[in-house]
Amino acid sequence: MSEIALIGKKIGMTREFYKTGRLVPVTVIKMEKARVIQVIEEEKRGYKAVQLGFGKIKASKLTKAMKGLYAKKNTEAKKKLKEFRVKDTELYKEGNEFGLEIFNEVKFVDTTSKTIGKGFAGAMKRHNFGGLRATHGVSVSHRSHGSTGQRQDPGKVFKGKKMAGHMGDRVRTMQNLEIIKTDIENELLYLKGSIPGSKNTEILVKKSVKVINKMTINEKIAAAEEAKKTPDKKKK
């Protein structure tokens, strides 16, 4: 089940207190259950995958093609469809639903969401440029990004040049975010730290791709308490 992901909506941020006195900033995500719409076999497309549906949508907003798909699968319409490559398709059956339980044994996750849009921004705000001098002959262009090219050779502005432009509203992935706790009854997921996006931003959550040997906060607290119980051999 670690091959698939879930989609949720960002509720906001709060904080979690521990008995050791430590305070941890937490992002709360309202997760949605995923339904298996169809299972894709290797014989048909050359790879194994599972297609999951998320959210609710009115049938009047669907295209004829999507209406035909849901009618063929005899399932209710879903707002979004996501396809995930899997190694074994026997674990998934059409119509089955998955929720937060797929993260029961997972410590760290990756999240993908869209950043907050900032509109048109200058080079100093967008790329953290220092700007030009405040005095000594500089006029009007104090917050300018400066030169954008060379001379006759190469005679052009290279692609990727950092300049003023639209800031934010980009899809970004955060890796190795620690799961603080899960509330399966209310379908809430608590992750350590901040996640890009405003309230109600859709967030894709999946098991971390990178394997890291890192202790969670709960494991650190348990290890510290265990160390207090064991007598120190140096002290006599």
Curated annotation (Swiss-Prot):
GO cellular component labels: cytosolic large ribosomal subunit
One Pfam family matching this protein: Ribosomal_L3
Stretch list, region Disordered: 139-165
SUPFAM superfamilies per record: Translation proteins
Lineage: Bacteria, Pseudomonadati, Pseudomonadota, Alphaproteobacteria, Candidatus Pelagibacterales
A biological-process GO annotation: translation
Family the entry assigns: Belongs to the universal ribosomal protein uL3 family.
InterPro entries cross-referenced by the UniProt entry: Ribosomal_uL3, Ribosomal_uL3_bac/org-type, Ribosomal_uL3_CS, Transl_B-barrel_sf
Function: One of the primary rRNA binding proteins, it binds directly near the 3'-end of the 23S rRNA, where it nucleates assembly of the 50S subunit.
Protein's name according to its UniProt entry: Large ribosomal subunit protein uL3
Disulfide bridge partners, by residue number: none
Keyword Ribosomal protein: yes
GO MF annotation terms: rRNA binding; structural constituent of ribosome
Gene designation: rplC
Organism: Pelagibacter ubique (strain HTCC1062)
